[in-house]
């Protein structure tokens, strides 16, 4: 068991960007087998898996992750990785303790935000896009984007305390993720007044119905794009978009990348 220093990971570092404000963005890739024992990292970090995958083990759970998966690691938290697929590639957002204090955030808040996976994934992709832009505004922009992570946690807390119909609505929307339901359709299924959904949806979901459905669709598309098994037109139709151009516009709006740019990451 050993502890990795700041901005160090078991894989090869392909790109690293330090804002000098408490955030480091590190892109890592795994081409060959690496150390599979217990280890930890100095700083807390969020990892978005872009390609490949691995079996992630902690003291209390084991999980197989792949493209589009999102995990949070507390500072000094012991974990190990086994059965890594090659090649694998990850984006790691590493957070200094001092920045958490400045933003009045805790590791627990960040861990909670990861449960709102689509919103947090898209923030990470936008942060990574800023590292590729890498101009005089990028460091401040990355800090501003990261500070939004608390929004995901706030809406999760409201969601957990919500009426029963809200959870039923979430399940329904995720079940029909590749469809385009309207308020009347949803209200009929849930035996509600459409105004009830319209009035309370932003409070519990943190956005409009249309925005939520776009997030679900684009979130589902991430693994489809990285699998290279379908072209963009097929993916657009599979995810319920009217055409490829609509899909491309929505994908860029949510992630900061064009689909083909994301595919090449």
Located regions from the model:
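The DNA-contacting recognition helix of HTH DNA-binding domains
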Residues: 194-195, 199, 244-245
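Short, conserved glycine- and acidic-residue-centered signature motifs
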Residues: 42, 162, 214
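N-terminal regulatory/effector-sensing and dimerization cores
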Residues: 2-3, 9-109
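Terminal helix-turn-helix DNA-binding modules in bacterial transcription factors
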Residues: 171, 175, 180, 184, ...
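Conserved coupling/switch loops of ABC nucleotide-binding domains, chiefly the family-specific signature
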Residues: 51, 258-260
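An amphipathic alpha-helical interaction segment
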Residues: 93, 97-104, 113-180, 184, ...
């Amino acid at each position: 068991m050993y502890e990795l220093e700041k901005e160090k990971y078991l894989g090869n570092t392909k790109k690293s960007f330090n804002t000098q404000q408490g955030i480091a963005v590190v892109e890592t890739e795994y081409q060959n087998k690496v150390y599979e024992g217990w280890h930890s990292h100095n700083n807390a970090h969020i990892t978005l898996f872009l390609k490949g995958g691995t079996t992630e083990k902690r003291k209390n759970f084991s999980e197989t992750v792949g493209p589009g998966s999102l995990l949070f690691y507390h500072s000094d938290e012991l974990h190990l990785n086994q059965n890594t697929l090659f090649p694998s590639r990850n984006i790691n957002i590493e957070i200094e303790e001092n920045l958490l204090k400045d933003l009045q955030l805790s590791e627990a808040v960040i861990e909670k935000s990861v449960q709102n996976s689509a919103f947090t994934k898209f923030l990470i992709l936008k942060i990574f896009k800023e590292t590729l832009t890498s101009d005089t505004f990028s460091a401040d922009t990355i800090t501003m984007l990261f500070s939004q992570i608390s929004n995901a946690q706030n809406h999760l807390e409201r969601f957990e305390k919500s009426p029963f119909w809200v959870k039923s609505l979430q399940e329904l929307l995720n079940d029909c993720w590749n469809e385009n339901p309207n308020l009347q359709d949803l209200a009929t299924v849930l035996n509600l007044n459409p105004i009830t959904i319209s009035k309370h949806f932003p409070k519990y979901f943190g956005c409009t119905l249309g925005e939520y459905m776009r997030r679900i669709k684009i979130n589902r598309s991430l693994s489809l794009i990285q699998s290279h098994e379908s072209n963009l037109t097929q993916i657009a139709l599979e995810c319920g978009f009217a055409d490829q151009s609509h899909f491309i516009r929505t994908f860029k709006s949510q992630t900061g990348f064009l689909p083909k740019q994301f595919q090449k990451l």
